[in-house]
Regions:
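Extended alpha-solenoid helical-repeat scaffolds
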Residues: 171-172, 185-189, 196, 200-230, ...
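N-terminal secretory signal peptides that target proteins for export/translocation
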Residues: 1-7
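Solenoid-like repeat scaffolds
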Residues: 150-154, 187-194, 220-229, 254-264, ...
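Eukaryotic acidic, Ser/Thr-rich intrinsically disordered low-complexity regions
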Residues: 335-391
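Structural detector for internal amphipathic alpha-helices that build alpha-solenoid repeat scaffolds
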Residues: 128-136, 159-176, 197-211, 231-243, ...
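Bacterial N-terminal signal peptides
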Residues: 10-23
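Amphipathic alpha-helical scaffolding segments comprising HEAT/armadillo-like alpha-solenoid repeats
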Residues: 139-147, 171-188, 212-223, 245-257, ...
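Transition segments tied to proteolytic processing and entry into folded domains
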Residues: 22-153, 157
Length: 391
């Protein structure tokens, strides 16, 4: 039993790690913070009410809500201007806040299960009502609606609007982004109060709606020591390539080649190449993208990631370079050895790869079996993708 556990544990850990780093399907490639939006939450509630808290009674554990707006209606609310919540919620002093309350209705009783405090005068009711009205609308109309709220004064609203974009696949927003106001996007990118996690989204917006000369805005951000150390660098790089394909790609390739660049910068460049490979091979030929990634094979701290991408893309003409990693210091680390093994196992009809696998099977048959099982797991969870370098 102990032997079985020793065999299974590395496989389980590797499978879990693979699952954790997988990008959510249908999500913006340059965004973080995917998840349920307030609009989604409203959709699952029986009713959603907005108003002012009053008459909080600690003894009875009740609080009244004076209804100012009904975001999601229910028959229970008809004719009511005040509802009593079965929760003790002492309101803040003064008249600064209103409350958005999500409720279920069970056995003829109101069940408030979530409350959100928002500043008085907030656009929250109008925002949520507008979003609900667009539930069945075309994606273009939804995107333009949420775009208007990205700079809303209410952080709950602006962050929720951002989350809608974060949950949207690139293929669904690509065309709409072409008609966005570039001047407004540039203003957001330059604003000191713009959260760094939004740089990637805004840069990709500019990549579609901007002019070639707007690339200097993104280049300046990439050269800024403070901004290039934050999240969203892959989006800045991708936007640069969209606006100036030749110049932008040379910049990305230069980062990939430079071992002295910080790991996070080179990794951002690698993520940019992944985006270009999957979504925009019209900007840079796949053969060029593969050769750009191949530059990472000589860099010990990132070689394994390069091997994994080359394998997933089916770039078998670089098999010799991948197998040559056996001669490097990087190959002494288990993660690099595993990536080379997976590459060799996946490589079709290649004598050198087959010989490598045969040798490894003699040395460590358990490691080879585990690698084969992981590849089967990956194949069952991932749609088939074309192989080759797109020559």
């Amino acid at each position: 039993m102990a032997g079985l556990l020793r065999r299974s544990l590395p496989l389980l850990v590797a499978a879990l790690a693979w699952a954790l780093v997988a990008v959510p399907a249908g999500a913006c490639p340059f965004c973080s913070g995917q998840g349920q939006t307030l609009t989604d939450e409203v959709g699952t509630a029986s009713m959603v009410i907005y108003g002012q808290l009053a008459n909080a009674n600690e003894g009875n554990e009740t609080t009244d809500l004076k209804i100012e707006a009904v975001v999601k209606d229910h028959a229970y609310l008809r004719g009511k201007k005040v509802v009593t919540l079965s929760r003790y919620v002492p309101p803040a002093e003064g008249d600064q806040y209103r409350y958005l309350v999500f409720c279920d209705f069970f056995k003829e009783k109101l069940d408030p299960y979530r409350g959100l405090a928002v500043k008085k005068g907030s656009d929250m009711p109008a925002y949520l009502k507008g979003a609900l009205e667009l539930k069945d609308a075309k994606m273009e109309k939804k995107l333009k609606f949420f775009f208007q709220y990205l700079d809303n004064e209410d952080a709950e609203i602006s962050n929720d609007a951002y989350k809608f974009f974060a949950n949207t696949d690139y293929r669904d927003y690509r065309e709409t982004f072409k008609s966005l106001p570039a001047a407004k996007v540039i203003k957001w990118l330059r604003a000191k109060d713009t959260p760094s996690f939004r740089y990637g989204l805004y840069a990709s917006m500019l990549g579609h709606c901007g002019k070639p000369e707007d690339a200097k805005v993104l280049r300046a951000m990439l050269e800024d020591p403070e901004k290039k150390a934050t999240s969203g660098v892959d989006g800045l790089l991708a936007g640069y390539v969209m606006l100036q394909p030749k110049e932008g790609w040379q910049y990305v390739r230069g980062i990939l080649k430079d071992k002295s660049k910080e790991f996070l910068m080179r990794y951002a460049a690698l993520r940019t190449v992944r985006f270009l490979w999957e979504y925009r091979p019209d900007l840079v030929a796949k053969k060029e993208l593969a050769m750009g990634v191949a530059q990472l094979l000589s860099q010990d701290d990132i070689a394994d990631l390069a091997v994994e991408d080359l394998r997933k893309w089916g770039v078998w003409d670089l098999t010799d370079r991948v197998l040559d990693l056996q001669k490097t210091e990087a190959y002494k680390t288990p993660i690099v050895r595993r990536s080379v093994l997976r590459f060799a196992l996946s490589c079709p009809a290649n004598k050198a790869a087959a010989a490598y696998v045969a040798e490894q099977r003699k040395k460590d048959p358990t490691a080879v079996r585990d690698a084969e099982e992981l590849l089967k797991l990956e194949q069952s969870a991932t749609p088939a993708t074309p192989t080759g370098t797109g020559k």
